[in-house]
Each structure stands twice: as C-alpha cells, then as structure tokens.
Amino acid sequence: MIKVIVCGILGRLGSEVLAACEKSGDIEVVCGIDASAQIPAEGPPVFSSFCTLLPEADIVVDCSAPSLQSQVLGYCVQKGLPLLSCVTGYTAAQKQLFSNAANQIAIIRCVNMASGLPQYLHMLMETVRVLQVPYAEILETHRIGKKDTPSGTALLIADMLKQAGCETAISSVRRRQARGSHEVALYFASQQIVLRHTVCSAAAYGEGAVPLIHRLMTLRAGLYELP
C-alpha cells in the first residue's frame, strides 16, 4: 500500500485526488494538509500545516497553492519524500526552487493530470509540424474562481507552439459553471483548424493522479516536467 499525504486536501483538486486514491485499492491517504477551518468529520486526519507529528508516508501530493511551496518542499526534502506537484502559477524563482530540491528527491510537476491531454498535445503539435502553422490562438475557459490566468496548461501550450516557431495569442474566459477547456485555432494558408480538449468533470484530474503516484514511486531524484 502506497501511503500519501495530500496538501490542499479540502480544495477542489485535493478532494478529487483523495476520492481517486480511495478507489485505487493500493493507495492510502494517511492525512491531509489544509488551512481551512472546515475540517471534515470523516476521512483521513487533516492538519493545518506540516509538522513533525504527521503519519509516515511514501509520497506527498501537492494540490494547494504557490504560497505553500516552501513548506511543501521543506518537508519533502527533510523526510526524503517524492513530490507530485499539481499546482500552477509559480514564478520563475519558485520554479528554480524545484530544480534545487530535485537534487535530493524525485519531483513530478504536472500542470494538468487529465489522461487525454498528452494525446491532445501530440495531435496538436503534429498538425503544427506537418502544416507548418505560422500562427495560433489559444482560448482557455475555466470556472470563475480559478486562481491563475492564463491557465498553466495554456501557458504550456503557448511555450510548445513558440518552440515550434508558431506565433501565439492567448485569451482567457471565466464562467460560473464552465468546464475546463483548451481550444487552439491554427491559421495557415487561408485555412483554419480548431482542436479542443475539454475536461467534463474534475474527477478526471484526480483519476490522472493515480498512475502518476505509481510512476513517482519508481523514479530517482530529479525533476520530471509533465503536461
């Protein structure tokens, strides 16, 4: 049984990771970290911060916020625990801290754990390559309340397109009950192709964490950047 600590366990993503781990059959969430005062009566124990009294664990999954990075990395390095970071919105300086910590522990950074995203990105970049697309527009749509704009996935797509020599613009939309969607319109030779990836339920993110947890258990110290 893989023992996991989930940071940000009471949030939208953290709760989905907890649910997916409980269904997996071989992953146990031994506790959560969350500053919220709404501590649930059932489920694993929830602590307000990292402390020496936390149960023993094999991995930390971080679903919290960039502001908690120092606490998360500090605990993982101190205990020698691998880290799955699902948080977006880090500054360049904070990203460097991941690189520093990766000298001692294995870290997977994944901006979007939906299982269909890697295939979507593959199709997108193959289309750009074959058609030599010079310009693309990214439209990312999420619920009101999402903390970072543009989304981490949109920034990832923009960076991939830039590396392929494709000029890119990003537009962000926030709606009350929006599904997480990334649409890329490719413009070339007086034509347009539109490719879209949509997450219909936040459960997709939690389910995507399970194989990443399994993978993390096999990795040596280092920083592994995934879509």
Located regions from the model:
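Rossmann-fold NAD(P) dinucleotide-binding segment
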Residues: F50-I59, S67-C86, K95-L97
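Short alpha-helices
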Residues: N112-M123
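Residues that mark the start of a beta-strand
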Residues: M1-K3
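Rossmann-fold NAD(P)-binding glycine/threonine-rich loop
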Residues: L73-G74, V87-I107, P118
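Rossmann-fold dehydrogenase core element
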Residues: P82, L97-A114, L131-A136
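Hydrophobic beta-strand scaffold residues
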Residues: V29, V46, L83-L84, I107-R109
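C-terminal substrate-binding/catalytic lobe of Rossmann-fold NAD(P)-dependent oxidoreductases
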Residues: I5-C7, R12-C51, L131-P227
